[in-house]
Amino acid sequence: MAAGAAACPEAEELEADFENTENNNNTNRIFMKKGTVIAIAVVALIAIWSVAAYNGLVSKEENVKKAWSQVENQYQRRSDLIPNLVATVKGYASHESQTLQEVTEARASATRITVDTDNLTPEAMLAYQDAQGQVGAALGRLLMIQESYPELKANQNFLELQTQLEGTENRISVERKRFNEEAQIYNTSLRRFPQNIIAGITGFVPKPYFESNDGSDQAPTVEF
């Protein structure tokens, strides 16, 4: 009996140790489960944030592309006016051949320069802006011819074309400004943390701006 009684405390101690071990294991499993849940939640949040940041950059870049399309549309509108304008001036000032040729050649050169909105580099922007500037300067010289030709100045078709040209120049200015605004919004997003990380990984690059000018690339307004 004494031996059996002595064994009981040892058995109870072993049982207590076993229970403590089980409790510790259960606690560890709970912590592991919590840690796993937290890790999954963190990964999910990062994934959601990454997708949102990427989609935001895509949206802003699309706005830049849309703004660029409007710029091109207005420059194309101006280009479409040139043949009729040249033909009208030629009817009254045919010997102004050099000026007429300059306008025609500037238009042809500008038409050959296209810009890929997916690769809108500063070099491409500069080449495009320079070509359009040459057109504007040539048109300015062409319009000044009317001062020497009263009949041309009074021609109704010429007056209508000049009105359309002036309206187009105004729209060009508006769309250029809008493009710069959209490009600035996009470029600012690229520099901000943490979008700059997503931009670096996914290949988003800054967009160039239209440079401000003194109006030398625009056809002047001539008072009648």
Model-based region annotation:
Residues 17-22, 26-224:
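A helix-centric hydrophobic-segment signal that preferentially recognizes long
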